[in-house]
């Protein structure tokens, strides 16, 4: 590591419930679940929604979710419409890739606070 690396920390960990295909969560939209966990992550970290620079959400089955479910979740969670949000679909690796993308955005000075 170079001498000018930043100290980047994960301040909380929250995830959606794990369900089964066509199970008890089938009537919930991914954006609604995303909004719930985004609010929970902000609460656990004592973050104001205005502090968040970007939301990166891992989602695999996006077929009926509408345009950019991460953006929908961010807006529902109270994150400003001026902030960015996007979905990563990398099957089983979507969540981990979201965290890695958040780290990269912070390291490159594109963002300071990311929810992934």
Can you say where each PLM-predicted feature lies in the sequence?
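Short, conserved beta-strand segments within well-ordered enzyme catalytic domains
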Residues: 54-56, 87, 114
């Amino acid at each position: 590591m170079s001498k000018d690396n930043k100290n980047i920390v994960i301040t909380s960990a929250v995830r959606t419930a794990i369900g089964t295909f066509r199970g008890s969560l089938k009537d919930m939209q991914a954006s609604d679940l995303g909004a719930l966990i985004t609010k929970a992550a902000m609460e656990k970290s004592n973050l104001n929604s205005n502090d968040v620079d970007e939301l990166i959400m891992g989602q695999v089955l996006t077929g009926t979710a509408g345009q950019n479910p991460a953006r929908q979740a961010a807006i529902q969670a109270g994150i400003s419409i001026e902030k960015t949000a996007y979905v990563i679909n990398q099957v089983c690796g979507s969540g981990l890739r979201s965290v890695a993308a958040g780290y990269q955005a912070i390291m490159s000075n594109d963002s300071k606070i990311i929810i992934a």
